[in-house]
Amino acid sequence: MADNKKIIEGLQIIVTDLAQQADGHAIQSKIFAAQGFSKLGEKYAEHAAEERGYVDKCIDRILDLGGEVKNEAKKEAPVYTDVIEWIKYDLQVSKDCLAWLKDLTEEARDDYTTYDILKEYYQDEEEDMYWAEQQLELIEKIGLQNWLNHQI
């Protein structure tokens, strides 16, 4: 049987960390759009909105499980003007998250509702990781300037 306390704690970590990631993606969206890379700006704006949706689902699930949602302080996160540095940073965040998230998803296997939420979030985070890896490979193949031209 799933350990609700451990699951609630895990969901709270997601709420706190993912809210910060959503804010970070929103900030990066504005920075890239201001640099003239509207497609990249739109991608990260959409990503921020998607992450906020997962935050909402996790908050709802904490409440459904009888937990108390906390509005915890968020760690300071870097802001980048260099696209490559940002993608590398974001890729590492995804990689770090996936190992931990896999364990939490396994912990929730008997709580089908939480399991489904975590599985969906895991799949989304995995797609983000693959996208970042593909973009870095593409930049290496066609060059940064050519890649940036596609982001206008």
Tell me what each language-model feature is.
Residues M1-I152:
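Iron-associated oxidoreductase/ferritin-like identity signal
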